[in-house]
Amino acid sequence: SAKPPGLFVFMGDFTRVPFGPTKYDFASYTKSFDQLADLLDEYPSIREECRFVFIPGPGDPGNTSAYPRPGLPAALRGHKITACLQKVEFASNPCKIRWHSQDLVFFRDDLQARARRGCVLPPVDDLGTEEDDERLQLDMSPKERERRKAMREKPLFLHLAMTLVQQSHLSPLPLTQMPIYWERDQAMWLYPAPNAIFLGDRSETQCKMTDVCNVGTTMVNPGCFADDGSFAIYYPSEREVDLSVVSAAEM
């Protein structure tokens, strides 16, 4: 559309190679943000009107692996990106944003893989079979049938979404697997339930709607843009998600 989105959220890792003194130096890391600034400089309406949020990933530089993780320090951002963008935030991970009366949570972690390793029992699909749906088709809209079919095909992500929302916390794992700063534990809370949770996970792009205590929370995995060009667009007014992809030819 002619009007650009109001908010862009970038979740790390911001380099293909994990940051480290022997793999990726400070100068190369800063240069990547300078290159992004040069690209955005060609689109005045975007850099002047839109808000940008950068959330570090597990492979980005930081002083700890415990959550919540602080935002990228100024020394690693360079000066060009902050000079180019009028509205830019280098936020913590996770990050909570209040946007047009909606509560949005962004969390970058390969949580689905972690949960799979710690899963004692596999997710149980209690939705029945498609034959059961056929017997109930008079009481079920086509949209509801499609939703149940999608849930049946991908129960693991739904299982993770329900776990996070029901426990009202972003970590379903013991501290030995996912350490947390107790003094900052409130940053991991999901109470009251947010309108949407964006989980930056390297698994496939997915979107699920959970309904806990009659509070609908949309959980989205936008995918990994660096791997296959996938990303997600969220429309707050309709509470709809558009899972998109940029082809290799376009990139």
Locate each region found by the language model.
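Extended recognition/assembly regions associated with phosphoester-bond processing machinery
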Residues: 1-251
